[in-house]
Amino acid sequence: AEEVQISQIGINGKPSEDKSAQCLASMQRLASWQNTRTEINLYYKDVFDNKGVMVKPSPGYSTSNHHKFCIFTKNKKLFAKMMHDKGIECNLHYTYNFSKYPALNVDNRTYPNTDFYVDHAVCIPCHQWLSHDEINKVVDTVCKINATIGVPSDVDSLYS
């Protein structure tokens, strides 16, 4: 795989009328969607805590909007492929250690925990359109694949 090079930062997004209409329609449903995502999140945590799936903890000072549900697995790319083979899409949100790009790290600091996320963090479906059957399929599949692949051994160093 080719290494991505980031030379500068910036933004070029310009909202158009159709995007503005989408945002307005979404805002009108936000409370309902948030409740659904929160319920899914709580269900996942309850099941996964009892099945040995390592869930990314949220800092005590934050309130999650549950737009992602992140777990740690020993090999996130293999995990995502195995999930895909079972018909479940995962997202690999944490794919780069941005502190390694000079344009994004002007003070030349290191962020050692970032490499852990790059190697182990994968997000499973947690959106408001999931049916109960789909949620249960995600849970069952995550638990089976997690039992095969395992969890990373160095997670304790992140939160100690």
Regions found by a protein language model. Give the residues of each.
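PLP-dependent aminotransferase class I/II
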Residues: 1-160
